[in-house]
Amino acid sequence: MTTEDTQYAHQPVMLEEVLDMWFSQSEGFYVDGTFGRGGHSRALLSRLGENGRLIGIDRDPQAIAAGQQLAASDSRFHMMAGRFDCLPQAVEQAGRPIDGLLLDLGVSSPQLDDAARGFSFLRDGPLDMRMDPTQGESVAEWLSYAAEKDIANVLYRYGEERKSRWIAKRICETRKEQPITRTLQLADLIESVLGRNEQGKHPATRSFQALRIHINGELDALDQVLEQSLETLAIGGRLAIISFHSLEDRIVKLFIRDHSGRAPKGRGGLPLGDELPQRLEPVGKVMRASKAELKVNVRSRSAVLRIAEKVA
């Protein structure tokens, strides 16, 4: 691991903002739906009272192991293995509604920094990208058989890659000659199609994001957990979500808007579609990482934090 990797590996994003705006009850029940290496959870436990409770959820085996170690040393904490949309099971286990749900979306720094996990286009490793390497198929496996149009659709839908068809065509041409099994192999292929036209941004960024989202079903899980939050949060409970790209943030933004009585209206103030009853109230403004945090944690530069409180 490089010096830069060590610096960023265990820095939870927007920690103070999350604790100040999201945490409200020292004896409450909280869920960290994306435990990772436990940065947010450990900070929350430092504020949680003796009778408070925190459940961490993650599907990454290394994160689960870290969570189990924490659980062994703190009886207020319990670790659950699974996607964050297993929220109902967490509530059932605790026997009470949630006072706060935190989701820190996307890939974690330890996952990105470990070449063997296959998330990074800067490090050579197996083209995997699964959050749980024991479940489902890897990106390499999917690319070995997926139809050209399906590859293009994934790159466009989840990566907003304008030249998705060009990349998909090159992938299908290349795999006829040799399998695409390594991260740098795919990154170089994409760069050969796009060139390096965006200053400060690797040409494979959008495609790697798209493939990761697809192979892990990330946006489907986000849709599900947002709906689950309406039924599992206590009145006054708060939902805090940190997103790192526009697709995630758009889903969160529209969900909070639609459930807070702020859906857009047409002429005469009439709703454009079915108007949902208000169940959420936004808390504060949309937040981004401070200048001070950006200096010590460059990976927080694209982070967006939205918080909403359940009111009904």
Swiss-Prot record:
Gene this chain is encoded by: rsmH
Pfam families documented for this protein: Methyltransf_5 (PF01795)
Protein's job: Specifically methylates the N4 position of cytidine in position 1402 (C1402) of 16S rRNA.
Major location category of this protein: cytoplasm
Cellular compartment(s): Cytoplasm
InterPro entries to which the protein is assigned, alphabetical: RsmH, SAM-dep_MeTrfase_MraW_recog, SAM-dependent_MTases_sf
UniProt family annotation: Belongs to the methyltransferase superfamily. RsmH family.
Gene3D superfamilies according to UniProt: Putative methyltransferase TM0872, insert domain (1.10.150.170), Vaccinia Virus protein VP39 (3.40.50.150)
Name of the protein in question: Ribosomal RNA small subunit methyltransferase H
EC number, UniProt record: 2.1.1.199
Biological source species: Alcanivorax borkumensis (strain ATCC 700651 / DSM 11573 / NCIMB 13689 / SK2)
Chain positions recorded as S-adenosyl-L-methionine binding sites: G38, G39, H40, D58, F84, D104, Q111
